[in-house]
UniProtKB/Swiss-Prot annotation:
Intrachain disulfide bonds: none
NCBIfam families assigned to the protein according to its UniProt record, in alphabetical order: PRK05255.1-1 (NF003593)
The protein's role, per its UniProt record: Member of a network of 50S ribosomal subunit biogenesis factors which assembles along the 30S-50S interface, preventing incorrect 23S rRNA structures from forming. Promotes peptidyl transferase center (PTC) maturation.
Alphabetized UniProt keyword annotations: Cytoplasm, Ribosome biogenesis, RNA-binding, rRNA-binding
Designated name of the protein: Dual-action ribosomal maturation protein DarP
Gene Ontology cellular component terms for the protein in this record: cytosol
Naturally occurring in which organism (per UniProt): Shewanella sp. (strain ANA-3)
GO molecular function per UniProt: ribosome binding; rRNA binding
Keyword check for Ribonucleoprotein: no
Annotated segments matching region Disordered: 1-26
Record keyword Cytoplasm present: yes
Any one Gene Ontology BP term: assembly of large subunit precursor of preribosome
Amino acid sequence: MKIVGDSEHFKQPYDSDEEYVSKTEDKRDCEAAQKVGMELVSLSKTQLDKIELDEHLYDSIQQAHKIKPKTEAYRRHMQYIGKLMRNVDVEPIKAALAIVLNKNNNETAKLQMFEKMRERLLSQGDSEIQTLVEHYPQLDRQKLRTLVRQATKELAKGPESKSSKELFKYLRSEIQD
């Protein structure tokens, strides 16, 4: 009769030298990968082209754009994209996704800054022109003054004016931060 002691018989999965990953942790990783896949699906084609993806994953994301959201087929397809994401290293994709999304936020912030400049120019007039020319010497004071006067006259007639748009375009083209 053989007595079984501290042998292989009593070993648990976490007793090995390798790092043990529980089912719960594995599920969390899978859900995180699926969420990254959902973020990729929400991107436009131009944004998606900026991210380096596996060809099969890219095609699946393009197919997801063709499926109507809030349908069972869409849900299954999102799970399939999650499955594909599990086989790919997610970290570089997350980093590229953050860069693409942050770039859009930076562009929006710049546009809002130019919008505020235009509003200040239209409300404060020459004093704001002086401040802007001191801060941004590349601006042409005369052109700025002309655009502000035209925009102010046109704004009295209606909310949208051609000169106001020209002023915005001029500020955006001349000021590079």
